[in-house]
Swiss-Prot record:
Subunit structure: Interacts with protein M1. May interact with host nucleoporin RAB/HRB and exportin XPO1/CRM1.
Annotated function: Mediates the nuclear export of encapsidated genomic RNAs (ribonucleoproteins, RNPs). Acts as an adapter between viral RNPs complexes and the nuclear export machinery of the cell. Possesses no intrinsic RNA-binding activity, but includes a C-terminal M1-binding domain. This domain is believed to allow recognition of RNPs bound to the protein M1.
Miscellaneous remark of the record: Average number present in a viral particle is estimated to be 130-200 molecules.
Gene: NS
Top-level taxonomic group: Viruses
Location within or outside the cell: Virion; Host nucleus
One GO term of the biological process aspect: exit of virus from host cell nucleus through nuclear pore
Assigned protein family: Belongs to the influenza viruses NEP family.
Lineage start: Viruses, Riboviria, Orthornavirae, Negarnaviricota, Polyploviricotina
Disulfide bonds: none
Protein name, per record: Nuclear export protein
Placement of sequence motif Nuclear export signal: 12-21, 85-94
Pfam families, per database record: Flu_NS2
Amino acid sequence: MDSNTVSSFQDILMRMSKMQLGSSSGDLNGMITQFESLKLYRDSLGEAVMRMGDLHSLQIRNGKWREQLSQKFEEIRWLIEEVRHRLKITENSFEQITFMQALQLLLEVEQEIRTFSFQLI
């Protein structure tokens, strides 16, 4: 995984965790959980692409990987909509910056996952 993407994920998760401390919002906790899940999925997909010989074992081991891929894209779209909504309603500049960076990261990761998936098909 690109080191910038790793640090971006870590930065966004840290910022959201700080925001969570000041909020009782369950939605924010759900977003943090989905960001962490997305990071792990993106990492594993990237590793599979780097080990192209692992492609067949990936397909054999998990015959439903295309279905999972589709589910991840739906999760990304949900996260994008949720982040956009949060961005519209917040007036706190720290939160605005965090959500703008989260939105940019989601769009980048969506593109990376698309690229990886095309290489795996």
